[in-house]
Amino acid sequence: MSGKQMDVIASIQEYINKILTNIQGMKVLVLDKETAGIVSMVYTQSEILQKEVFLFEKIENTKEKMLHMKGVYFIRPTQENIQSICDELKDPKFNKYHLFFTNTISKVSLDEIAKADEQDVVSEIQEYFGDFFAVNPDTFTLNLPGMLTKKSPRWQGDVGRVVDGLFSSLLALKKKPVIRYSSNSDTTRYLAEKITERMNRDRDLFDFRRQGEPLLLILDRKDDPITPLLHQWTYQAMIHELLTINNNRVSLAKAPGIKDELKEVVLSLDHDIFYKENLYKNFGDLGASIKDLVDQFQDKMNTNQNIQTIDDMKKFIENYPNFQKFSTTVSKHVSLMDELNRLISLDNLMEVSEVQQELACNHDHNSIYNHVLEIVNDSKYTDRDKLVLVLLYSIRYEDGRVWELKEKLSSIGIPPKEIGLIDTLRGYAGASLREGDLLGTKNIFSFARSVVKRGLQGVSNIYTQHKPLLHDILDSILKNKLKETSYPYLSTTQSRERPQDVIIFMVGGITYEEALTVYTFNSLNTGVCRVVLGGTSILNREQFLEDLSSTQISNPSSSSGRR
């Protein structure tokens, strides 16, 4: 195992820290739309202000002249950003310019900047490879939804950004990997080829000390369309599924009676110990964790109310900032759990989820068909949940009674466009198009295995039996048995050894259930194999359905299945 663990949060933090500590004196930090999000996910504003940063600016904003300040730019090397810098250098706003780009900058762009720098105010130009959004230490995203296939409307415009982000992550993690891809996917092969081209073009950047041969495995979301459709029951995944996490921020604006200061909350692993400790806890255990948190807060409240001496008052004042922070943490998580509870109850999600899990884990066809039909016929369930159950059924039983369920959805008033997603999903991720054993017979035993291996109780033993396809892929990597026919190497010279460091990147987006899968794998295999997971986006059900509806795919066999 490499001496230094792969940690995408630490990689970005290291870049930012190096930039701000190496440049002495008061400075203005200038960011673009993307790097503002990248930085905010690993540092708070107050932490950055402590590093002699006087002000934050967006590159697109008109800036006042501050000739006593240094301008420190952390931006993507886009043509738009290069042009903004060149325009500004004609009439400099700062006495010195320190330019840090999140990816490789072309010689043409360097020449443009040099030509524009007539007043000789550019002190340095550097490449610091922080061109991705670090979510968890072992999880990153590029925040690019709508990238399921080459037929997606956004593909042509954003595929270059995907290559940039993945290339940057390799350099940030200091890995020069061999590359494998999903054999049934043009998109993963295309991306593998583009990354290889970049690595060859910039081979000098990959002059790292070698300790084993890392692996970059590029996967396609279509190989597992089930995971993004399922309701989630662990904390981080539930929040994203029901409320949506956007760059560590969650809106509670729709929660009844919510206080103004809680309408948007921040969830940060570095600054919220409760969130960090409960990230992957299941719903059944979260209630106890919240109760413990509230009990701790009440104990502190009682202690603070017992102020009788000057010393007591002094201690209270010294501890007041920590007390305020603790109070905010309690309010935030109680509000989050309250809203999650409300939504689960409102939409009867536990009952829906139980049928979803049965569908995902290969139960008896007649029984599951009847369960799906019962929910479709019952007005207490949402139309969205009814549609998703039929989507899952259509993947699970392609030759089943899909047409009957489509007619049933139509009869209860679900619009034809939404019912059309059933054919779209099968055209995108039908059995003949998928790689890997998504619905293999071993899943029959997943319920028993999950109970025996993890000893889960209560809510989780019913609602978390499903394992993503990624679980089996990681198991194959660990045993050095990942099939070359399914996941070929791009180059002919490949390592036969089990990789110690693995970067898995999924075109079309990842889920927080898969992030949990990677976290669990890493926890069980410390010192043996370490995995980092990245994706074009982090999906929840709504985003996946939106991405699906924007693709121009139809199911060539949409009329089949009727008997």
Curated annotation (Swiss-Prot):
Keywords: Endosome, Golgi apparatus, Membrane, Protein transport, Transport
Origin superkingdom: Eukaryota
A Gene Ontology term for the protein's cellular component: Golgi membrane
Signal peptide: none
Gene Ontology terms describing biological process: Golgi to vacuole transport; intracellular protein transport; vesicle-mediated transport
Membrane-related topology note: Peripheral membrane protein
A Pfam match: Sec1
The UniProt record lists the keyword Cytoplasm: no
SUPFAM superfamilies listed in its UniProt record: Sec1/munc18-like (SM) proteins (SSF56815)
Locations listed in the record: Golgi apparatus membrane; Endosome membrane
Principal place of residence: Golgi
InterPro entries from the UniProt entry: Sec-1-like_dom1, Sec-1-like_dom3a, Sec1-like, Sec1-like_dom2, Sec1-like_sf
Biological function: May play a role in vesicle-mediated protein trafficking from the Golgi stack through the trans-Golgi network.
Name of the protein described by the UniProt record: Vacuolar protein sorting-associated protein 45
Gene source species: Dictyostelium discoideum (Social amoeba)
